[in-house]
Amino acid sequence: MKYDVALFDLDGTLVDSVYDLYIAINLTLSGLAFPIVSQRLVESWVGNGVEVLVKRALSGDMQVSEHLDESLSGKAILEFYKHYEQQVGEYSVLYQHVETGLAALRGMPKALITNKSRIFTEKLLDKLALTSHFDVIVCGDDM
């Protein structure tokens, strides 16, 4: 079977970026006088974007509390972005064989599709020397 293009997700597919998120979440929570959470909890909460991640952290649960104050969550999301901007790519690592796999696809057009914001995506890709592998990069805030 021949393919014309290879499409990739970023977080959890090419890159293990959970520790960066874990640090940024806990800096956000502690700054708002909320208890910090475990990396395991953060791992279970990722995958639905930053807003949901932050709301889950404020709720302390996978299920966002129906009583969560929108003003508080808005403030927390802004704080998270500030912390994450400092953390993105600091502890992220490529999964095993990613470089080999991308090299094996040299010559084939490759696109990266992620729900991560462009500013964070570009910073992460640059830090991990992945930018040049992709012909097209589509981010969550592009749509």
PLM regions and their residue ranges:
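Short alpha-helical
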Residues: D20, G49-V52, T100, I119-F120
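Hydrophobic packing residues within well-ordered alpha-helices of enzyme cores
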Residues: I25, V54, V98, T121-L125, ...
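Alpha-helical substrate-recognition element adjacent to the catalytic core
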Residues: L32-M62, E70, H83
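Metal-dependent phosphoesterase signature
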Residues: A57-A103
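Substrate-recognition "cap/lid" segment bordering the active-site pocket of phosphatases
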Residues: E90-V93, S117-M143
